[in-house]
Amino acid sequence: MAGITIYEFDALTACPPSAPNASGLRAVPKPVFDWLEAQALAGGTAWLRLMQKGGRRAVQALGGYAGVIRAPDGYQIEVLPKIGRATSGDQADARARQLFIRMLCCLARFRHIQTESACLKAARMPLLEVFIGEFLRAAERVVKRGLRGDYVARRGNVFALRGKLQMAAHLRRNLCQRDRFFCEFDEFSSDRPENRLLHSALRRTLSWTAWPAHQQLARELCFVFAQIPQSAQPAQDFRRTRLDRSMAHYTSALAWARLILQNESPLTGAGGHDAPSLLFPMAEIFEACVARHLKRQLAPPFTLRVQAGSHSLVRHREQGWFRLKPDLLVQQSGENRLVLDTKWKLLDNARGNSEDKYGLSQADFYQLHAYGQTYLKGQGDMALIYPKTDAFRQALPVFEFQPPGLRLWVLPFYLEHQQLILPDCGSLDCSWSRSVPFQFSPKPAPVL
């Protein structure tokens, strides 16, 4: 199946296949470009905008989203995290794809991904095929454990007496058919919502996948579900699912089926079932990734709270307005000790001048100042956490707010090693014995 791999902020234009890329533009077939342009003009697509570049009409995949865009004709646009382009080394696409899979596993609703096998597949196949492969393996495990059935109430004119004879209906229908019985009975059947959903998801993946191994496995599984009808109303069937102890092995497969049938990624394109766009907000994924690993590596007695929202910026008529919600809050015995906020942006240690300011945002500093005044009462340490790249490999010198007392650190997070890189002294404050003891290496990570 035809497709292209791009990174966040890359621009796409319609070019003849033989025309070289110009001015950083990536070429896609004209029908695909026309569809993307129509999506941007229709509005409601947070991941796409119109632009002009090099004198050509183009559409830009906005930063902050990664995943797969699938055009109605099956053409796939794979959008990888921008950090993959900001690191050196061979096989950048494969490494970026593997890193994205590992990060995606940190989201609660995607923890069913088998990380190691998915990362191995990501080195040689597009993201959509990785997702399809994970679903097929999960469905295969369900089949090996056995499809669960349930008793379903039936009514019918049958040849043998079953269940309860419905006398009125029997006399009305069978006055001249002495060999029939109109009965109401319970029949054990595999036609239940969970199986209908899996069958529908299998049929859809069979139409999506271009990988021969996936096509073969999907056909084999569809044969197992052949006697079970597909789900006519997936949303209603998902509400009817019951995952009790005997259905625990269905959990992973149904989670993938929800993603496939309802396009239930955090962001879904406007293409509907014929053109699913499975895009994921990288800011949310990065926050979840940092939170998951810091929570494991914080030394006791410190604890980590995610999205704490106990303070407001102002009070008005006895109500708190403008809730202040730092991404992460480190506490000790209920006392706030450190405020952390994650940013999915790329910094550059070499741009440390008054004009470029490393690529930092003034708005982020205002935000952290408000957090420090409310959560730390104007005294203490805060940190902004950015992804580590070749250009941003070590913590920046501390930033001090005025009046003195509130300080801000800018730290890189090494995604491949799940490691927060602290300042050279090894803690956020070399002079404080009360400093939060993160158990991480203080030295810059090696170049990838």
Regions found by a protein language model. Give the residues of each.
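Catalytic core segments in nucleotide and nucleic-acid processing enzymes
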Residues: 1-40, 270-448
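Residue(s) in the substrate-gating loop at a strand-loop-helix junction
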Residues: 2-270, 275-276
